[in-house]
Amino acid sequence: MARVLEVQGVSKRFLGLQALKGVSLGLEEGEILAVIGPNGAGKSTLLNVISGLLRPDSGRVLLLGEDVTHLPPEARTHRGLGRAFQIVEPLPELSVRENLLVGALFGKPRTSKREAEAWVDRVLELTGLAPRAEAL
């Protein structure tokens, strides 16, 4: 299997606090990784570095072999890398359908709008939300 995500020797400090020190990990295609630990262990910092919300002080983040360490979050998202926050909330200015479409379009690389819309329609039917699809 191909290595999809690789974190190489990532470190991050906040003033005098060492949040991450030499963190390395790799994910193969289809693999799932759980990051667990107590409050303050650096879990959110690691996810923020991987997703581009924070820049590491040292180390690299590779996506499908490409170094994305210095790319902004939106460029990483367009390459298929994003994150969900602990409290997931829909975008309030978008309808139910549009919120699902955001995930369908940007959650998978190279998904056409037609494929994404078909997926959204299936999800709306499966969840019973089709009657509320256009609600904000």
Predicted regions and their residues:
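Short coil-to-helix segment of the ABC ATPase nucleotide-binding domain corresponding to the Q-loop/switch region
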Residues: 93-104
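Helix-to-loop junction immediately C-terminal to a conserved catalytic motif
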Residues: 51
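ATP-binding/catalytic-site motifs of ATP-hydrolyzing domains
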Residues: 60-62, 66
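Conserved ABC ATPase "signature" region
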Residues: 113-132
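ABC ATPase NBD coupling module
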Residues: 55, 67-87, 110-114
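The feature captures the beta-strand-to-loop junction immediately N-terminal to the Walker
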Residues: 36-38
